[in-house]
Design a protein with these regions (language model features):
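Short amphipathic alpha-helical face segments that pack within enzyme cores
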Residues: 29, 101-112, 193-196, 335-342
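Active-site beta-loop-alpha junctions enriched in small/polar residues
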Residues: 19, 67-69, 127-131, 157, ...
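Hydrophobic/aromatic beta-strand patches that form the interior of the parallel beta-sheet core
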Residues: 62-64, 125, 150-152, 311-313
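A structural signal for short hydrophobic beta-strand segments in well-ordered beta-sheet cores
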Residues: 41, 50, 84, 220-223
Length: 349
């Protein structure tokens, strides 16, 4: 494929709304286009993958992964988010930066690497439900892929390599009290009870600090209490956003939190674990040898689902993701293809 074909493939995806769990039309389009390129993908649900021949030949396997779903359009778009527009080097449209550019760049890298002699096999995949960490996305096809030795997860990182990624825990907390009339000295105010726990979330510092991800971060982001001005509230609900740093398991963090606060604490999910890769891993050493900068990512991705080594690297800028007038540069895509190929061509696992 040439750069013009990659651009047209990306623009075709942008033109098809594909919010999480509604990716069918985008998957249909991509499946058809891949067949037109002579690539016959396997499909499960709204997930597609292409597997190089030779399963079971003993070579290690590298998974190249990007996602086809998007968030819903942000407020403030000055143009139709589903009408891709080229303006010089820029392509505007929802999903250009997150994650269409990585998808097409990894596909082109896969195609270029196929005829080259390598010590590993490749699987390229375009998966659904990444933005919601859904069970119908990458997680649903991993059992079909066999043993994976390394994943390259394409996300907008400016082609820096994330060797660590924060996880995510969202807590629904409820502080209880006893209702009463606000004019009398009666009842137990649940808001005051909640404040003690909120202050703990605000001030507590976890001891273990990651070199790449820093400390565990906790933020109270939503709060709700009371029914009317003259009734002492008997419950106060609040939400806490927690970003684990790889040095605590999610279960360990939950044990610490529940042992420190008095409110009821219910995690929405414990699936979003943090991830990190040994900096002595061959792919990290290879990245260093060709001048790729390493960093720790504060945002989550499909890496949270993987129990084998992975890194995150892709064209674009994370700051453009989930924003109005999202865009990617064509030069960023072309440059990413070259870096992916250089990174993998010389890799020995």
């Amino acid at each position: 494929m040439n750069n013009a074909e990659l651009t047209e493939l990306l623009k075709g995806l942008v033109a098809i709304p594909s919010p999480s769990r509604q990716e069918k039309d985008a998957a249909d389009y991509l499946q058809q286009r891949l067949a037109g390129f002579g690539l016959e993908p396997v499909r499960k649900g709204n997930n597609l993958w292409i597997e190089e021949e030779g399963r079971g030949d003993g070579r290690p396997v590298i998974l190249l992964n990007a996602h086809i779903d998007t968030v819903k359009p942000a407020a403030g778009y000055s143009r139709d988010p589903f009408t891709p527009v080229e303006d010089g080097d820029i392509i505007y449209g929802l999903g250009t930066n997150d994650d269409g550019a990585s998808l097409v760049a990894l596909l082109e890298a896969y195609v270029r690497l196929l005829p080259l002699r390598r010590s590993f096999r490749m699987i390229w995949s375009a998966t659904a439900e990444e933005e919601v960490c859904g069970e119908g996305g990458l997680d649903s096809i991993l059992p079909e892929l066999g043993k994976i030795d390394l994943a390259i997860v394409g996300e907008p990182t400016g082609m820096k390599m994330a060797v660590a990624e924060k996880g995510l825990i969202v807590l629904d907390c409820t502080a209880c009290g006893k209702s009463g009339h606000a004019a009398r000295d009666e009842g137990e105010n649940a808001i005051y009870n909640a404040l003690r726990d909120i202050d703990w979330f605000r001030t507590h510092s976890f001891e273990r600090v990651s070199d790449y991800l820093g400390a565990v971060k906790m933020s109270v982001t939503m709060i709700s209490a009371g029914t009317q001005h003259n009734v002492v509230p008997d419950n106060c609900r609040f939400v806490v956003d927690i970003r684990p740093n790889g040095l605590y398991s999610n279960a360990e963090l939950m044990d610490i939190i529940r042992g420190s606060v008095s409110c009821e604490v219910v995690p929405r999910s414990l699936r979003h674990g943090s991830s990190h890769i040994d900096t002595d891993h061959p792919v990290v050493r290879r990245a260093g040898s060709i001048g790729i900068e390493l960093f720790g990512s504060p945002t989550t991705s499909n890496q949270t689902l993987l129990d084998f080594p992975s890194v995150k690297i892709g064209p674009g800028d994370s700051a453009r993701s989930h924003t109005a007038d999202e865009y990617i540069l064509k030069s960023e895509i072309a440059g990413a293809v070259e870096i992916y190929v250089e990174l993998l061509e010389g890799l020995e696992l």
